[in-house]
Amino acid sequence: MKKENRDKIVALRHDLHCHPELSMQEQETKNRLITFIKENIQLEVIDRGNWFYVQYTTKRQSEMPEADTKPPIAFRADFDALPILEDAESLPYASENPGVSHKCGHDGHASALAGLALELDANGADRDVYLIFQHAEEIGRGAQECVPLIKEKKIAEIYGFHNWSGFPKGAVVLREGVSQCASRGLTITFTGKKSHASIPEQGKNPSVAIAKLILYVQNLLQATTFEQLVLATIVNVEIGTKDFGISAGEGEISFTLRAALQRELDELEQMIRTQAEKFAAEEGLQLSYAYDDPFPETANDAKAIERVRNAAEKLHLP
């Protein structure tokens, strides 16, 4: 990449870092990216509302007849931020939006994809290429809105990456097979009956059942043998309110469940639900379940991995 283009995408990344936006609120971020692309290259930009893509179309038959036999491919990046306070205030491009920052590096992801757009515009490709700029990755909603494009354009392969600290600059780190665990948020609500704090026996307090479930899950992961990585992380527990005259009548516990294999994620959830029902029955409580942020496992295609490895070796990247 020419230094001029590199300087442009570094400046773009700093601009995005200054103005982070939360998932489903990224209109200004999207506009900044579209403006950058339209000001610097001639490729077509297609705005799909919450997200957009850039389209490189080969010159069919006349100059590149071989392109007709090569299926389209896509590259994808995200551009939403997180509800986390910026802790690098000394940087000249620190977040200007209180309580919001690019802690997952999506400013870098989107800028890198914009850099690829610059290269495509200058150097071309031997097939049609689609650059997908996706919103709302952090809450698991954005990708679903982009999926129809795959069928619409008959895209055969999609490539993406995540920045990863701790490796040499410019290193290309590849993982065969599963690269990201399947995961989902599970909230279990225990409903009993409130009573005066002086007569707790006349109510049904969920605290004992929730305490039992916490201990069960802690022991479960130590005692149970799964084929691959499995995690159940407690992210929130709420029981009653801070009212010293009332014995709690409702409580809930939330887990993030993760597993390298989808079937083991399902198995883990069922084990937790079975015990929750047992503990609830012992205390005379009712149960309900809610789910958030479901993600299937992400498994890398072996042939795609090999193509990336070969490209990195040709460029002498570590």
Predicted feature locations:
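Acidic/His- and Gly-rich active-site-bordering loop/insert found
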Residues: M1-H102, S111-G115, E119-R127
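Conserved active-site and cofactor/substrate-binding residues in soluble primary-metabolism enzymes
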Residues: E4, M24, E28, R32, ...
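Predominant activation on well-ordered alpha-helical scaffold segments within soluble catalytic domains
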Residues: V10, I34, A114-L118, Q144-V147, ...
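Active-site beta-loop-alpha junctions enriched in small/polar residues
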Residues: E21, D78-D80, A136, W164, ...
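Histidine/acidic-residue-rich, glycine-tolerant segments that coordinate divalent metal ions
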Residues: L82-I84, E89-S101, D107-G108, N123-T233, ...
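Metal-dependent amide/peptide-bond hydrolase catalytic core
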Residues: A211-P318
